[in-house]
Amino acid sequence: MRIKNKKPYYLKRKTVIVDNEGGKYPGYLEEPIQIKANIAPASGKLQAEIYGERLNYILNMLYDENEVMTEGDGICVYVPKESKPDYKIISIKRYSHLVIELEKLLWV
């Protein structure tokens, strides 16, 4: 992957947040981790068949560095690193680099 095509983004790990009443709900850690990746809109016949109308909310991320990511982690794509992530990882495919599919979080 060409270095000049990579841009900085911020990864926020998923976690379980416990409120003061003992309720548990999913959330993201506050400390962002900077990564460099290439992100582009999803396209193609296969992804159109898989996601249908959700395709407008899907991005493809190409990543070839060492930071470990899991499905459900958040990525700050169009928001600053201090805010909640606007995309989450829904699929990780391992080739010579990682092809990661991101889906827009609509609660942002």
Spans of features found by a protein language model:
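Extended boundary segments
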Residues: 1-40
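Short, conserved turn/kink motifs that form compact alpha/beta structural patches or helix kinks used as
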Residues: 25-108
